[in-house]
UniProtKB/Swiss-Prot annotation:
This is Aminomethyltransferase. GO terms for cellular component: cytosol; glycine cleavage complex. It catalyses: N(6)-[(R)-S(8)-aminomethyldihydrolipoyl]-L-lysyl-[protein] + (6S)-5,6,7,8-tetrahydrofolate = N(6)-[(R)-dihydrolipoyl]-L-lysyl-[protein] + (6R)-5,10-methylene-5,6,7,8-tetrahydrofolate + NH4(+). It comes from Thermotoga neapolitana (strain ATCC 49049 / DSM 4359 / NBRC 107923 / NS-E). The gene is gcvT. It is an enzyme of class 2 (transferase).
């Protein structure tokens, strides 16, 4: 299994280590509950260095990225990032990603850990007709998320840039412990927070500083368990669970990242799919504390209407919650049943997100 540059730090902190997409990663350090609460009330520090970073560089960078993704990359200025998806020719989602516009001739695409090789090959194939160079810099890059309502005031003590001046989905280059870092106001928790991109050799030093300053405000390192709970509470999607190449953006609530005023891979298919959306991703609150697993059947009036895509117990809400891909006939407020081994459990369709935290929504 692959290790991030922070593997030794996780072991030293006593983390429970697990396999995630071929990486050995911390599931939790103390407990998932405590780590979720730290993120919600103070700050959590996450190693997300398993994510992939692919650099696109050259005169046609903006045109190329814009052709590759569904959102309008040409509309954002330098110093901004953008959430988007890449689709295949049939409209299926190849991956969801965040793209940073470094300059007119350089972009960094941050992709899911399980998809690094697939995405890299996909991007290279489509780059052949453009004046760009594509490089996979994942192994030499580290990524740490610093998330929670106290993230700005805490991080400000150790960086040389004004964090208040970094808007939502914006970034600046700065220094932390003398090391160069890209600091973006992005995250996957539903709270205000930052993600710090750096050279892999700088990661351990920076991690130690971040864990120390988090501890000063009752924050703590947080593992993949807390990350998954936080993203589900915020109704953020996970590739491979809530979407994949068998789903299109309209089915999973991502129509807002599809801009039809430009050309891109999969556009023709999506124009047709938009006219006949038969499924949708909904939020469910379940009775009791049992966790609905991916693939569990969802019933409405005894008839199957879909499947669970993600489920977990929410410590923030004190409820079992889930996302499900269901027939478009399902409406908010509907009473459904989820088929567990041995019994059916009642569930209600609620509005997304389950939880709205301190995340900044302004541009």
């Amino acid at each position: 299994m692959k290790r991030t540059p922070l593997y030794e730090r996780h072991v030293a902190l006593g983390a429970k280590m697990v396999d995630f997409a071929g990486w050995i990663m911390p599931l939790y350090y103390s407990s998932i509950f405590e780590e979720v609460m730290a993120v919600r009330k103070s700050v959590g520090v996450f190693d997300v260095s398993h994510m992939g970073e692919i650099v696109v560089e050259g005169q046609e960078t903006v045109d190329f990225v814009n052709f590759l993704v569904t959102n309008d990359f040409s509309a954002i200025p330098e110093g901004k990032a953008m959430y988007t998806v890449m689709c295949n020719e049939t409209g299926g989602i190849v991956d969801d990603l965040v793209v940073y516009r470094i300059s007119h001739e350089k972009a960094i695409m941050v992709v899911n850990a399980a998809n690094i090789e697939k995405d890299y090959e996909w991007i290279k194939v489509h780059a052949k007709n453009f004046n760009v160079e594509v490089r996979n810099v994942s192994d030499e890059t580290a990524l740490v998320a610093f998330q929670g309502p106290k993230s700005q005031e805490t991080l400000q003590r150790v960086v040389d840039i004004d964090l208040e001046g970094i808007g939502y989905y914006s970034f600046q280059w700065g220094r932390l412990d003398g090391e160069r870092v890209l600091v973006s106001r992005t995250g996957y928790t539903g709270e205000d927070g930052f993600e710090l991109m750096m050279n892999a050799e700088s990661a351990a030093k920076i991690w130690d500083t971040l864990v120390e300053i988090a501890g000063n405000v009752d924050g703590k390192p947080a593992g993949l368990g807390a990350r998954d709970v936080c993203r589900l509470e915020a109704s953020y999607l996970l590739y491979g669970q809530d979407m994949d190449e068998s789903t299109n953006p309209f089915e999973v609530g991502l129509s807002w990242v599809v801009k039809m005023n430009k050309d891109f891979v999969g556009k023709e298919a999506l124009l047709k799919l938009k006219e006949k959306v038969e499924r949708k991703l909904v939020a469910l609150e379940l009775s009791g504390r049992r966790i609905a697993r991916k693939g569990y059947t969802v019933l409405k009036e005894g008839k199957e209407v879909g499947k669970i895509t993600s489920g977990n117990f929410s410590p923030t809400l004190g409820k079992s919650i889930a996302l499900a891909l269901v027939s478009r006939c399902v409406k908010t407020g509907d009473r459904l049943e989820v088929v567990f081994p041995g019994k059916n459990v009642e569930a209600h369709v609620v509005k997304k997100p389950f939880y709205r935290g301190s995340v900044r929504r302004e541009a």
